[in-house]
């Protein structure tokens, strides 16, 4: 979340930034109005508490029974007035928090202004897209033909937007997982976290309460399936004060992820691009505020390194204000070339969240100079989405005879050079 004091300034710049994030400025005006009411009520409550304490001391020390009786009556009136104001405060605070918790992060100055993905800006392409002297098959046709996936049986077992990897398909997914972890193993500390998380964890990473409909809740419990390992890794240090000397911290985890894909009806209904259960390797950094910009650039290169080693065509996009995630202050997307669609598809998002998540999760460090406890900055990246990487390899490395060549860098993890 954002600093309340920053939001209270109601500057023209903040209004423009929120507008560029498609945030309703009427809500912002209501936030400011409620904040003033809360400040006034808080001063009243503090004054009433002070009067109540003075009254109680006088009642305890007076020797006059009549005076004591009068003071006790006054104390009762003060308590009643205090309870009334506290109830009013709590009522307004609930409305205030509802808005405050839904205000998105503010974009940095170099983020392009735009409404949606159509206004994202391409930074560069890595290499020429893959073209063939034959008509390439979409991944779901070729992988089914080679008995690598079972979409129909997954639908029978569970339902739509689920898949089963089998034989060389399961083997390729295992190789992808290992490769994604090992490429950055020298920099990031690996974790294997639970895929079930609580509400506080989702709140800390910024998904709740705004995106509560996008995740799976375990019926009859207060637990949820994690939509990304970012949730678990960001919350490793929730409610902690770190030593400045211990920064930065780099974490990685490879997990199954679960999303309800609410609002995605009709999108990518065939194949492995958009599923309820998918797999990815996540990177998370917890860093000193002064270094987060440089750490963001380095993190993008860490994700790109995987695509470079696999010799897959990709491009880097900087997301516009209207397409960035809720918690991000700046985001790069890596998009990999999908031959059957003749276009690039997202395979990684790399976001700098500034202190937005740290404020929600209450993650601080003790500054060595000022001795103050300050909020850290957090960053996250998919490195990479395994299912989409599977799609990219199958499609870009398909051969004229219907086989799939395994990228050189992946052969030692997969164990052979071709899938036939």
UniProtKB/Swiss-Prot annotation:
A GO term, aspect molecular function: serine-tRNA ligase activity
UniProt-annotated location(s)? Cytoplasm
Keyword annotations from UniProtKB, A to Z: Aminoacyl-tRNA synthetase, ATP-binding, Cytoplasm, Ligase, Nucleotide-binding, Protein biosynthesis
**What is this protein for, i.e. what is its function?**
Catalyzes the attachment of serine to tRNA(Ser). Is also able to aminoacylate tRNA(Sec) with serine, to form the misacylated tRNA L-seryl-tRNA(Sec), which will be further converted into selenocysteinyl-tRNA(Sec).
Organism source for this protein?
A: Mycoplasmoides gallisepticum (strain R(low / passage 15 / clone 2)) (Mycoplasma gallisepticum)
- Listed binding positions for ATP are 259-261, 346-349
Respond yes or no to whether keyword Aminoacyl-tRNA synthetase is given for this record.
yes
Protein encoded by which gene? serS
Name the Enzyme Commission number(s) assigned to this protein: 6.1.1.11
Assembly behavior: Homodimer. The tRNA molecule binds across the dimer.
Q: Pfam families, alphabetically?
A: Seryl_tRNA_N, tRNA-synt_2b
Q: How does the record comment on the protein's domains?
A: Consists of two distinct domains, a catalytic core and a N-terminal extension that is involved in tRNA binding.
Give the superkingdom in one word: Bacteria
* PROSITE patterns on file: AA_TRNA_LIGASE_II
Biochemical pathway: Aminoacyl-tRNA biosynthesis; selenocysteinyl-tRNA(Sec) biosynthesis; L-seryl-tRNA(Sec) from L-serine and tRNA(Sec): step 1/1
Residues reported in the UniProt entry to bind L-serine? 228-230, 282, 382
Q: Which reaction does it catalyse?
A: tRNA(Ser) + L-serine + ATP = L-seryl-tRNA(Ser) + AMP + diphosphate + H(+); tRNA(Sec) + L-serine + ATP = L-seryl-tRNA(Sec) + AMP + diphosphate + H(+)
> Which InterPro entries is this protein grouped with?
aa-tRNA-synt_IIb, aa-tRNA-synth_II, aa-tRNA-synth_II/BPL/LPL, Ser-tRNA-ligase_type_1, Ser-tRNA-synth_1_N, SerRS_1_N_sf, SerRS_core, tRNA-bd_arm
Q: Which CDD domains match?
A: SerRS_core
Q: Which NCBIfam families match?
A: serS (TIGR00414)
Any one GO CC term of the record: cytoplasm
Q: Keyword Cytoplasm: yes or no?
A: yes
Q: What is this protein called?
A: Serine--tRNA ligase
According to its UniProt entry, the protein's GO biological process terms are: selenocysteine biosynthetic process; seryl-tRNA aminoacylation
State the family it belongs to: Belongs to the class-II aminoacyl-tRNA synthetase family. Type-1 seryl-tRNA synthetase subfamily.
């Amino acid at each position: 979340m954002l600093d309340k004091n920053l939001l209270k300034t109601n500057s023209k710049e903040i209004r423009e930034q929120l507008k560029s994030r498609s945030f309703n400025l009427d809500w912002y005006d209501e936030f400011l109005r409620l904040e003033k009411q809360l400040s006034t009520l808080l001063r009243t409550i503090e004054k009433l508490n002070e009067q109540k304490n003075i009254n109680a001391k006088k009642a305890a020390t007076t020797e006059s029974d009549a005076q004591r009786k009068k003071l006790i009556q006054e104390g009762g009136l003060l308590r009643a007035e205090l309870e009334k104001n506290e109830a009013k405060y709590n009522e307004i605070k609930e409305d205030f928090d509802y808005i405050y918790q839904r205000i998105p992060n503010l974009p940095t100055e170099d983020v392009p202004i735009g409404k949606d993905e159509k206004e994202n800006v391409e930074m560069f392409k890595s290499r020429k897209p893959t073209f063939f002297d034959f008509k390439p098959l979409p991944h779901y046709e070729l992988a089914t033909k080679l008995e690598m996936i079972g979409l129909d049986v997954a639908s029978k077992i569970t339902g739509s937007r689920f898949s089963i990897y089998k034989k060389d398909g399961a083997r390729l997914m295992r190789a992808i997982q290992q490769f994604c972890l090992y490429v950055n193993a020298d920099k990031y500390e690996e974790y294997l976290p639970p895929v079930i998380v609580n509400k506080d964890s989702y709140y800390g990473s910024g998904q709740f309460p705004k995106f509560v409909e996008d995740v799976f809740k375990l019926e009859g419990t207060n637990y949820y399936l994690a939509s990304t390992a970012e949730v678990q890794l960001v919350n490793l240090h929730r409610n902690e004060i770190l030593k400045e000397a211990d920064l930065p911290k780099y974490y990685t985890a490879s997990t199954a992820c679960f999303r309800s894909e609410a609002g995605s009806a009709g999108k990518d209904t065939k194949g492995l691009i958009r599923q309820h259960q998918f797999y990815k390797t996540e990177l998370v950094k917890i860093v000193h505020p002064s270094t987060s910009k440089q750490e963001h650039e380095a993190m993008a290169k860490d994700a790109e390194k995987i695509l470079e080693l696999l010799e897959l065509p990709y491009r880097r996009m900087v997301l516009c204000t209207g397409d960035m995630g809720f918690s991000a202050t700046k985001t790069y997307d890596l998009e990999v070339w999908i031959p059957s669609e003749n276009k690039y598809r997202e395979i990684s998002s790399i976001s700098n969240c500034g202190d937005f998540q740290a404020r929600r999760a209450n993650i601080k460090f003790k500054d060595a100079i000022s001795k103050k406890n300050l909020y850290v900055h957090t960053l996250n990246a998919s490195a990479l989405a395994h299912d989409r990487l599977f799609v990219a390899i199958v499609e870009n490395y398909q051969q004229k005879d219907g086989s799939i060549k395994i990228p050189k860098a992946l052969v030692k993890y997969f164990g052979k050079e071709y899938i036939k």
